Swiss-Prot record:
One of its GO terms (cellular component) is plasma membrane. This is UPF0391 membrane protein Tgr7_2500. It is found in: Cell membrane. Its main location: membrane. It comes from Thioalkalivibrio sulfidiphilus (strain HL-EbGR7). Keywords: Cell membrane, Membrane, Transmembrane, Transmembrane helix. Pfam families: DUF1328. Belongs to the UPF0391 family. InterPro entries: DUF1328.
Length: 52
Protein backbone atom coordinates (compact mmCIF):
# COMPACT_ATOMS: atom_id res chain seq x y z
CA UNK A 1 0.00 0.00 0.00
CA UNK A 2 2.88 2.33 0.72
CA UNK A 3 4.21 1.56 -2.75
CA UNK A 4 0.94 2.67 -4.33
CA UNK A 5 1.05 5.91 -2.35
CA UNK A 6 4.55 6.59 -3.67
CA UNK A 7 3.45 5.85 -7.24
CA UNK A 8 0.55 8.30 -6.98
CA UNK A 9 2.88 10.89 -5.43
CA UNK A 10 5.26 10.57 -8.39
CA UNK A 11 2.33 10.83 -10.82
CA UNK A 12 1.18 13.98 -9.02
CA UNK A 13 4.63 15.56 -9.21
CA UNK A 14 5.02 14.77 -12.91
CA UNK A 15 1.51 15.96 -13.74
CA UNK A 16 2.06 19.14 -11.76
CA UNK A 17 5.27 19.97 -13.60
CA UNK A 18 3.58 19.37 -16.96
CA UNK A 19 0.67 21.65 -16.06
CA UNK A 20 -2.06 19.08 -15.49
CA UNK A 21 -3.29 20.57 -12.23
CA UNK A 22 -6.49 18.51 -12.08
CA UNK A 23 -4.65 15.23 -12.46
CA UNK A 24 -1.98 16.36 -10.01
CA UNK A 25 -4.58 17.29 -7.41
CA UNK A 26 -6.41 14.00 -7.75
CA UNK A 27 -3.22 11.93 -7.64
CA UNK A 28 -1.90 13.75 -4.59
CA UNK A 29 -5.24 13.30 -2.80
CA UNK A 30 -5.17 9.56 -3.54
CA UNK A 31 -1.57 9.35 -2.33
CA UNK A 32 -2.50 11.10 0.92
CA UNK A 33 -5.47 8.81 1.53
CA UNK A 34 -3.42 5.67 0.86
CA UNK A 35 -0.66 6.89 3.17
CA UNK A 36 -3.15 7.59 5.97
CA UNK A 37 -4.72 4.16 5.53
CA UNK A 38 -1.23 2.64 5.68
CA UNK A 39 -0.48 4.51 8.91
CA UNK A 40 -3.80 3.50 10.46
CA UNK A 41 -3.23 -0.16 9.61
CA UNK A 42 0.32 0.05 10.97
CA UNK A 43 -0.88 1.46 14.29
CA UNK A 44 -3.67 -1.12 14.54
CA UNK A 45 -1.27 -3.96 13.83
CA UNK A 46 1.23 -2.66 16.38
CA UNK A 47 -1.38 -2.21 19.09
CA UNK A 48 -3.29 -5.40 18.37
CA UNK A 49 -0.32 -7.63 17.73
CA UNK A 50 -0.07 -11.03 19.32
CA UNK A 51 1.73 -11.16 22.59
CA UNK A 52 3.24 -14.43 23.69
Amino acid sequence: MLGWALIFLIVAIIAGTLGFSGVAGAASWIAQVLFLVFLALLVISLLGGRRV
